Regions:
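Short acidic, Pro/Gly- and aromatic-enriched capping/linker segments at domain boundaries
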Residues: 136, 141-146
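Conserved helicase C-terminal RecA-like lobe
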Residues: 160-166, 172-186
């Protein structure tokens, strides 16, 4: 949606199939409509597929490392972005239900100076898990690897570093209002 002040607002509900294509199409459409800044809403986003995350980050960010995964044996895989990028001020809205790929989306945009992060502290789910079903209906999830930002920063146990910690307590979206205010300052 293009807001009256020229801000493009894009909600990303998860990083599952086609997320990157849909978000890229939304950014392109908003830019064609004259968006002067972008706000990505990843509140209540539980994460998803890493290839969707890295495709979207590659589209948004300039050349360089954007994501690192390390398996239990210590083998690292570094994902890099190409030189093409979106040069608009950006903000990312997060809350306590923003997890995994959604956290890394916000963290990498912030780390590269492309976006500010506004909202509530996140959990810091920075690892991959494999789930094994148990015979009586339960399941056990075992961590099989860890994730890092392009510079090697971990989110495990810390979550995101917020540029503005803001809670929505009433009918107004105070987090969006704070993000818009921060983008005006930039």
């Amino acid at each position: 949606a293009l807001l009256a002040d020229g801000t493009g607002l894009i909600t990303i509900q998860n990083f599952n199939s086609r997320c990157a294509d849909e978000a890229i199409a939304a950014v392109d459409a908003l830019r064609e409509q004259g968006a002067e800044r972008l706000v990505f809403d990843v509140r209540n986003n539980g994460g998803g597929f890493l290839d969707e995350l890295t495709r979207l980050l590659d589209y948004l960010l300039p050349e360089g490392p954007i994501f690192i995964s390390r398996d239990r044996a210590g083998h690292e895989e570094i994902t890099n972005s190409d030189a093409d990028c979106v040069e608009l001020p950006m903000a990312v809205l997060v809350n306590a239900d923003t997890y995994s790929a959604a956290e890394f989306f916000a963290a990498e945009l912030q780390e590269q100076g492309a976006a500010v992060i506004v909202g509530e502290p996140t959990s810091g789910k920075g690892y991959s898990q494999q789930t094994f079903p148990l015979p009586h209906g339960g399941a056990v999830a075992i961590s099989t690897g860890a994730y890092f930002t392009g510079s090697g920063a971990s989110l495990i146990g810390t979550g995101l570093t917020l540029d503005a910690e803001v809670y929505n307590t009433g009918a107004e979206d105070a987090q969006l209002a704070a993000a818009l205010e921060l983008l005006e300052i930039r």
